[in-house]
Amino acid sequence: MAQKDMQDFDKIIVLDYGSQYNQLITRRIREFGIFSELLPNTTTAAEIKKIAPKGIIFSGGPMSVYDGGAFSVDPEIFELGIPILGICYGMQLISFKNGGNVEASTEREYGKAEITVTDKDSDLFKGLPEKQTVWMSHGDKVTAIPEGYVTVAESDNTPFTAIENRDKHIYGIQFHTEVQNTEFGNDILKNFAFGVCGAQDNWTMNDFIDMQIEKIREQVGDKKVLLGLSGGVDSSVVGVLLHRAIGDQLVSIFVDHGLLRKGEVEQVMESLGGKFGLNIIQVDAKERFMSKLAGVSDPEKKRKIIGNEFIQVFDEEATKLNGIDFLAQGTLYTDIIESGTSTATTIKSHHNVGGLPEDMQFSLIEPLNTLFKDEVRDLGEKLGMPYELVWRQPFPGPGLGIRVLGEVTEDKLKIVRDSDLILREEFALAGLDKTVWQYFTVLPGIRSVGVMGDGRTYDYTVGIRAVNSIDGMTADFSRIPWDILQKVSVRIVNEVDHVNRIVYDITSKPPSTVEWE
């Protein structure tokens, strides 16, 4: 059977106009089984023609289409005959470029709004209720639609909430289908993707695995690849995927800096080195890191010390190896998007990964750079990786070094390790380990008076942090049931030495960050 490539899959591309929800649009389309990618708004009609997508989506954005310097579009894209859906700014751009009118709205709409579908023959709203709740986020609105377009939905403040040109298959909606607050958002996107574009849901993770293995083998040949294992999800999945493709041509370096979670070193070595057979060079650098951190309390100094020391250790080990031609990284699609939707930009900015010396010339392999985080977890499961590795909590590069506020000592690290394990165990028992985006314990360095048994104590406070987020840019504290928090609290106080008080962090991001340091 012939090997599949990207030309074998239907695609819908999203042009990036700066919306905070851009990644969500792409993810929603992929969830339908259709491959989707985010491209710069400067992408030309000729470039799109080569990609041959089934559909094009113009995203939302913060600009006003009538301002000088506003993001625009190659007008030839409207003549390709490929269905187009404009969302928010995208709809305004379609109207503006085709003879309609867009003005600043006297009443801005941010948040939930009620719309009414006014055309029962609408392609976008086919099979959906007349009244719907949607999520608006706009300060401009269309005040006159182009010739050939019809209005298919309206709201009290926005008479042209959705428009269609069925002859040219060009559509616009003023609200955001991609966010959960839009009641029938997925259905509208499905009507566009399947009904209008005629796309097939033929994109699967198993196809991705087969294509990546073939691609890696072609790229690497008989040469060797170096991977820095952190114990996190991304590098672990990269390791297993590469090993399946090229076996022992992959050499991994795992630096134990003494700032990992309880049982993490053993789990990585037993699972990746044992079950999956990765060739792992384990470096015990605990004493080296702790000696450098002694007496240091400033969080930025701690980060720099940990980062620089990690680079140095990795460099020392890498220079001992001969015949390495490739460096593998766990770069995700989100990293590329945040670098300006440009793969070339990302490769350049990440090329000297970990501060590797300039004379160590590696070619870069980034097998996950078209995937989102949730897709990486799906990939890990398809590769047969254990639940504990695939669903491991996000973990900062400096590790527990920034979850111990102030000076890092072995005693303080033990408190964080033990309390964090209890939190993870109880969240797993309660089924919260997949529903809460990130959760961990932190040692603020606060000591307070308590009573345990018949005696007075003066011990540490442990903080619990649990948040929900989509992309980490903003986050809201999780509403954890009190009985679960109480159980965690009782266990930590009883099972972890030198702790007599537990607090729960109920601040969101912003104003706080997810991590305390």
Curated annotation (Swiss-Prot):
Q: Where is the Glutamine amidotransferase type-1 domain?
A: 11-202
Listed GO CC annotations: cytosol
Q: What class of enzyme is it?
A: ligase
Enumerate the GO terms in the molecular function aspect.
Answer: ATP binding; GMP synthase activity
| CDD domains from the UniProt entry | GATase1_GMP_Synthase, GMP_synthase_C
Q: Name one Pfam family in it.
A: NAD_synthase
Q: Could you tell me which residue ranges the GMPS ATP-PPase domain spans? A: 203-392
What InterPro entries does UniProt report for this protein, alphabetically?
Answer: Class_I_gatase-like (IPR029062), GATASE (IPR017926), GMP_synth_C (IPR001674), GMP_synth_GATase (IPR004739), GMP_synthase (IPR022955), GMPS_ATP_PPase_dom (IPR025777), NAD/GMP_synthase (IPR022310), Rossmann-like_a/b/a_fold (IPR014729)
Please give the PROSITE patterns that the UniProt record associates with this protein.
GATASE_TYPE_1, GMPS_ATP_PPASE
Reactions catalysed, as given in the entry:
XMP + L-glutamine + ATP + H2O = GMP + L-glutamate + AMP + diphosphate + 2 H(+)
- Enumerate the UniProt keywords alphabetically: ATP-binding, Glutamine amidotransferase, GMP biosynthesis, Ligase, Nucleotide-binding, Purine biosynthesis
Active site: which residues?
88, 176, 178
In which pathway is this protein known to take part? Purine metabolism; GMP biosynthesis; GMP from XMP (L-Gln route): step 1/1
This entry's Enzyme Commission designation comes to 6.3.5.2
Q: Which residues bind ATP?
A: 230-236
What binding partners and quaternary form does the record give?
Homodimer.
Q: What is this protein called?
A: GMP synthase [glutamine-hydrolyzing]
Record the organism: Latilactobacillus sakei subsp. sakei (strain 23K)
